[in-house]
């Protein structure tokens, strides 16, 4: 069984007196920067001139510099930008400012694993990837807890890369919950697979198919929305708390029996074969090439798919229903 590492396994002093540059101030960026700052470390934020995030970061008491200046001033550089822009910003702003002994860090292995970013041999290259959104990383830290994280070493130029990665994980609160060691390849391929086959692609397709089946059979769209989308959270919360066993222990016998007897008719061996094909496309780099080319061409297909999905009836029904949910209404 994989070993988890905790606070006592990591030494925060390894980053004491060092300057940590957080490149980007989005969901993960703001959480990492503020948690590291509250851990007593010296943090600066790298943003492009005119970024709307400059005011937010400065209001939080953080020093903001251009990406190039932040990279130049830092010992430890964490890149928390969208995958599709990392290559260009790294090449133009970060790479020219790297020095021997620096740490180049990522929260996802995509660009390193697929060769979009090729670091020099004289820097450490590590990954620290919280397994939760930024707001949760921040909120749990403030509550004295943390979000579990993955960490990995791609290149150990200093001989301390692993310890430095664990130190950073401790600084953002990850070792409070536990951190698991992996590799850039393993994190990248499993993360992409989970997103595509289960969490995003698989779940979205399942929800829409269920909704469409009920509506096409003449049932009210509002009821179809409740049964196929709204109640997903109720089930997922149980699964997260105690696995499939707790979920099944918490639902009715009718629902549990239907789970066992009908579920395998939805996710069949053919479905699993398609999952294996999707995994192969990830492993071979086919998906990465497709995604890179799509972005290089201006995202025409991506934009069209976004527009089409936004016009699905489930979005219209959901918007109207959510407007009536008192607990979702803005104060």
Swiss-Prot record:
GO terms for cellular component: cytosol. Mg(2+) 2 binds at residues 191, 227, 231. The active site is at 108. One of its GO terms (molecular function) is NADP binding. Residues 183-328 form the KARI C-terminal knotted domain. Residues 2-182 form the KARI N-terminal Rossmann domain. Mg(2+) 1 binds at residues 191, 195. One of its GO terms (biological process) is L-valine biosynthetic process. Its EC number is 1.1.1.86. It catalyses: (2R)-2,3-dihydroxy-3-methylbutanoate + NADP(+) = (2S)-2-acetolactate + NADPH + H(+); (2R,3R)-2,3-dihydroxy-3-methylpentanoate + NADP(+) = (S)-2-ethyl-2-hydroxy-3-oxobutanoate + NADPH + H(+). It holds the Pfam family KARI_C. It is an enzyme of class 1 (oxidoreductase). Pathway: Amino-acid biosynthesis; L-isoleucine biosynthesis; L-isoleucine from 2-oxobutanoate: step 2/4; Amino-acid biosynthesis; L-valine biosynthesis; L-valine from pyruvate: step 2/4. InterPro entries: 6-PGluconate_DH-like_C_sf, KARI, KARI_C, KARI_N, KARI_prok, NAD(P)-bd_dom_sf. It comes from the Bacteria. Its cofactor is Mg(2+). The keyword GTP-binding does not apply. Binds 2 magnesium ions per subunit. The keyword Metal-binding applies. Substrate binds at residue 252. Belongs to the ketol-acid reductoisomerase family. This is Ketol-acid reductoisomerase (NADP(+)).
């Amino acid at each position: 069984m994989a070993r988890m590492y905790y606070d006592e396994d990591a030494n925060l002093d390894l980053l004491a007196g060092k300057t940590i540059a957080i490149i980007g101030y989005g969901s993960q960026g703001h959480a990492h920067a503020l948690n590291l700052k509250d851990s007593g470390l010296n943090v600066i934020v790298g943003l492009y001139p005119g970024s709307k995030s400059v005011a937010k970061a400065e209001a939080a008491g953080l020093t903001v510099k251009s990406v190039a200046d932040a990279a130049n001033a830092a010992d430890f550089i964490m890149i928390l930008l969208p995958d599709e822009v990392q290559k260009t910003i790294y090449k133009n702003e970060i790479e020219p400012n790297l020095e021997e002994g620096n740490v180049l860090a990522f929260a996802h292995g995509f660009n390193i694993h697929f060769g979009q970013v090729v670091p020099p041999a004289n820097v450490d290259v590590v990954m620290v990837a919280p397994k939760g959104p930024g707001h949760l990383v921040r909120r749990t830290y403030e509550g004295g807890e943390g979000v579990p994280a993955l960490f990995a070493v791609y290149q150990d130029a200093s001989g301390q890369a692993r310890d430095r990665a664990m130190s950073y994980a401790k600084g953002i609160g990850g070792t409070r919950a536990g951190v698991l060691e992996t590799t850039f390849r393993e994190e990248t391929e499993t993360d992409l697979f989970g997103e595509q086959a289960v969490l995003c692609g698989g779940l979205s397709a399942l929800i829409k198919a269920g909704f469409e089946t009920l509506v096409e059979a003449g049932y009210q769209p509002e009821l179809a929305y409740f049964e196929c989308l709204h109640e997903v959270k109720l089930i997922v919360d149980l699964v997260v708390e105690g696995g499939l066993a707790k979920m099944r222990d918490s639902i009715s016998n009718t629902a549990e029996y239907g789970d066992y007897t009908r579920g395998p008719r939805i996710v069949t061996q053919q479905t699993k074969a398609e999952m294996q094909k999707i995994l192969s496309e990830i492993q071979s780099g086919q998906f990465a090439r497709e995604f890179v080319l799509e972005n290089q061409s201006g995202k025409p297909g991506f934009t069209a798919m976004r527009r089409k999905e936004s016009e699905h009836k489930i979005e219209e029904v959901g918007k109207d229903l959510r407007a009536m949910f008192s607990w979702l209404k803005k104060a």
